[in-house]
Amino acid sequence: MFASLDTPAVHQRKKYEFTPIGHIKEKENMIAQELRQNKRPPLEDEEDAAIEGNYMKRTRVGDDTMNSQQLFNETSFDDTLPEQTLQGISAIKKNLAPELLSNDNKEKAELASNPLKEQQHALQKLNMENYSLRVKCNSLLKFLNNVTDDGKLKQGLEMLDELQEWKTKHHELIQRFKELQLRYDELEQREPEPLKVAEPADHSHCEKLRAELETSLKETRSQLDEVQATVSTLEKRLVEVKKDYSEKEHQYKMSLDIAKSENNRLTSSLSSREDALNEAQEKINRLMVQLEEFDHTSGSLLELEKKIDDKNQGIRNLETRLQELNFHRQDLERQLLTANETIEALKKEHEEYREQNELKLTSLHKNTSGEDRLRKQLRDLAEDKEGLQKLRQTLEERNKELDERVEALESQVAAIEEDRQKIIGEQQQVVRNLKLEHQKRAQNLKREIEELRELNQQLEETNRSYKKRFEHFSRNSPARKATQEELTAKDREIGALKRTIRDIEESVLRTTRELETAKIQHRREKSMLEARLDQAASEEPFERSRLEKEISMLKLEIRSIQDTKERELSLWESKYESLKNTYEKLLQQDKHSNLNEILEDRREELKSLMKKYNDLTTENLELTRELNKQKSHKEAYKEDLRKVQARLDFITKEFVKLKESAPEPKDSSDELNSKWMEKYQNMKIKLLNELKVLQDENIQLERRLLDRSQQQSHNLAETPTQSRDSSLQDKVDYYRLKYHDEVRKNNDLRVINEYLNRVLKASSQHLKLDILKLENEISPLNSSTTYINDYDYSYAPSYYSRRGRPLKFKTVAIFVLSCIRMYQATLRRRWDQQRINYLQRKIAYGEDRITW
């Protein structure tokens, strides 16, 4: 018994055990599974899929959507057209408009109260329409592939087109009939004017209208009868065509069944002639080839890993060397300072010695016995002087080397600035292109507005002509009320059209604003992408070392800035003390009551200013919290928007595919396309409006923040050093956190690399051992002639019933501990990232610039 490595499928993972090397399964279970698979006869559907080369999922048995022809039988008419029994006009409902309007208003109110539900409702409708169109297209394609075209298919399609045309005519006639009925009802409902006794009323106009209506009713009924007759003939022709299609389909299925049976016979004859020994040899050869390939790949991988390790070590050595050089430079600077101090001290001592020696010489001239001592002292002094000069020369040489290094770093900084200027030029070019696009869109929108205005003028002219006609009729006819009502209705329609034109103009303005916001977003996203690209490019060793050098330079600059700030602080303190002393002197000189009152007023003003400062700081903190919340909401909305836009893009792509795969376009397809485009534009407008609202809120909050910061800067002009110190501390914390983050990433990558190397080595060793065992077990079986399948196994059946080793408590405990550690690591990572983002924003606001 030996274990073999494999990558199981999803439904076979229960039979395997997971290890760091791979999934393990026993040999006998694998062989039994192979035998079970060989024993099972192949199904007809599987053989068809294997012959055709299609690896799609099999459809369900009960699903006949792909093979059904019910799409060609669908009509908006019933099997038998109902007779149009004209009841009395009083029995028919006279005005259905208010009921329909109330139902529509209810649905609109329910949807308008909840915009998310409205959006979901629209998406569900789009999905349903998309699914129905896809099913229709698939069934049409399958039907067209299965049926041979002898001219009858075109006839059937033409008949379907005629049917649709007759349907539209039928609907139009019904609508006209309903309108005439409504007009007839309105005429009946009108109360007759009070008759005068002296002058009899003329009803000739009403009688003429009634006669015209009756003639129009008769014409519509005759047209309806004709339409019904044509529809019945067309349906009969459709039934005949369907019968022909069904016969052809039956013949095609019979031929397919015959071909499948022949294929099954051929495959069974081929499978019976194959030998088991050839299969075993082929398997062994495959394993050998795989082993050789794996050894080759593992060798190349190890070489690459060694190279990567060498490069990483080189990077680490360079980093350590850089740090050592920095420390060495700092030590040299300290030594320079100490050497200068020692030189000055030695100069002082030298002068003292010279003075002492001159005194001693004067005394020694008197006493010749002390000449030897003086000579020795002079020699010692000369030697000390020479040593000091050598020290000075070495220190000057080191200073020159440091100056050269500083110049090289300055040249690198100049190259970086040139690259930055190039990137800025590219960004400006992109902005120009966006401006041109925006101008083109604005011109198109202006053209649309002009067309709408022309339409409005035409409608106004038609309205005037209608008014003139109605006035003429109202003077001659007694039905003046009806004409006035029609005039008011037309005026309302004109007002509604004007409102729609205003709405369209407002939407144009909104689109222009949204285009500007989209430009700004594009710039931001481009800058973010460029920053990411720069970060990705900076992962190379040379650029990484350059960045680390820049970091060290920045640290030195920060230290120098801190020193200068401390000096400035000391100067300001000295000035403050001097001013304080002068002020106290003035107070001692002029002990008047006015000065004391002014002092008290100033103190009160200081207290009030301090209170205002505290209030402003609290408000600033609250505003920052609100800003963070708004940004989180904005990010959530952006994610929702991305999902919706991805869904819309998917729907539009599939719609284009369906349009391309569908037959020649017709009136119905054009109407569907227009509906889809309207829905898509409505959805897009709603989403853009929401985005615009969020962006406006964000801009308002940031403006408020900027105003607050400006007020604080005006109020706190007396204490600039505190803000500078805090900004410096924030920068130091930001760079420290970024550095620790990069170190953690490098450590994680190193651990993963080491683990993968170990796993690859162990897996290659296991594979080699398994292949050696296979060779040892198979070689005696091939040579021996007394090999029999029957073998008395000494193991119990319960031994083979086990599917794997039971889990130990230690493994579960280690797994739980690793999960806890992973959770803690993710929490730390999240906190650090939040801190980095907060510091970045704080630094940006401190420098009076916006980076969002």
Curated annotation (Swiss-Prot):
Subcellular location: Nucleus; Cytoplasm, Cytoskeleton, Microtubule organizing center, Spindle pole body
Pfam families per record: Nuf2_DHR10-like, Spc110_C
InterPro entries xrefs: Nuf2_DHR10-like, Spc110_C
GO MF annotation terms: chromatin binding
Keywords in alphabetical order: Coiled coil, Cytoplasm, Cytoskeleton, Nucleus
Coiled coil segments of this chain: 158-711
GO BP, one annotated term: mitotic chromosome condensation
Subunit field text: Homodimer.
Protein name: Spindle pole body component 110
